[in-house]
């Protein structure tokens, strides 16, 4: 495979990843708004954050993740701490 083709393939993958992240943000934005407007069950918040973790490499989705964590930290501190640690294990560069 020529280098030019490799570069084109990588650019296409990057474009697709951006599109997927945009879709994830658009799907999770109303869910995050809803969760932050009330007190949801631990299982509902945990389920949502677990699924959002896959997309937290995107700053917009990460912002939603953080909003939910801030809203529920005093309500479900152990679960939120676990979710934050999971984020760090997956996405922190260090």
Predicted regions and their residues:
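Generic structural concept
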Residues: 11, 46, 65-69
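Amphipathic alpha-helical binding modules
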Residues: 59-94
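Amphipathic alpha-helical interaction modules
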Residues: 15-63
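Polar/charged low-complexity regulatory segments
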Residues: 7-16
């Amino acid at each position: 495979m020529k280098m030019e083709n490799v570069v084109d393939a990588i650019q296409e993958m990057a474009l697709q990843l951006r599109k997927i992240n945009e879709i994830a943000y658009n799907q999770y934005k109303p869910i995050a708004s809803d969760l932050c407007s009330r007190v949801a069950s631990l299982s509902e918040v945990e389920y949502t954050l677990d699924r959002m973790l896959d997309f937290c490499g995107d700053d917009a989705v990460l912002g939603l993740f953080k909003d939910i964590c801030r809203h529920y930290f005093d309500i479900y501190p152990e679960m939120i701490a676990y979710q934050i640690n999971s984020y760090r294990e997956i996405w922190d560069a260090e």
